[in-house]
Amino acid sequence: MKTGLPTPEQVAYVRKQLGTSENDIRVAILVIRKWLKMQPHLPQNIDDARLERMYINCKCSLERVKTSVDAYFSLKNRYPELLMNRNPREIIGVCKKFITMFPMPRLTDSCLRVSVTTNICENPDDYDPLVMSKAILLWSELMLREDYSLGDIMILDMKNVQAGHVLKTGIGLLRGLEMIYRGAYCRRIKALHFVNAPKVMDMIMTLVRAALPEKIRKRVMTHLPGSNTLFDHLPRSMVPNELGGTGGPAEELAEDHRERYWPLVDWFMEQDQFVSNESMRPHNMTCGMENGFSVDGSFKKLCID
């Protein structure tokens, strides 16, 4: 049950919802390419498929796409620990030892992409939030190549989460992750569902409030262990079996998704070459990451009174 590429019908639906067309997209890409050639600090190495998905994910705003293209190359300088030296075999090989993450293979009827995080390790010592964040951004890069959707619905299974997991997660890391996810990859979070909400949910929400913008905080929903409230928002076919759905076994879905990366290992590693040259940035132009995406880049740990 491999993650499916968008069907022609889904592509048409997404474009209709955004009020755009094949011709509009071609023109937009030409405009962006012309703009990109005028940016001495930015590489030219981004294909039309990624530009098209940026345009779609930015709701067809050319100015937002320009900001995102800048951030796509510039944020590698600011967050090399997240965006450089990304060997999928190494990152995924470590990540799968302590957590399972994957997208559901089909889009929802409204062309949203559901992603699932589950099976977090019981021992916080085995949990590595930096590796997990790198895996999330690998997925974001893959989606920029392949996906065609109107936004993301995230299911986060909190079973096994303890205070140690929360305290080990840095606020700065989450802020950087969110900024890259939204700014460079233009992903739009439509809902965050915390299922099997644990006793430390208050600590988790403290982290969420500290790290995420208010707009996203308002889209957070929690579901108690044993409840079916998740299915008030999603059909069971969009949820893996282990969480009460009928979408298939989580590990099988995850393994199918992992296989998507193996032919792209060299491509991911080659992307390290394509980074902004900040010494060439025009003096009257702010960095894309500072134009609406500025945050403290330090990876501070969460402090709870």
What are these regions (language model features)?
Residues 1-305:
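Basic, amphipathic alpha-helical/coil surface patches used to engage anionic, phosphate-bearing ligands
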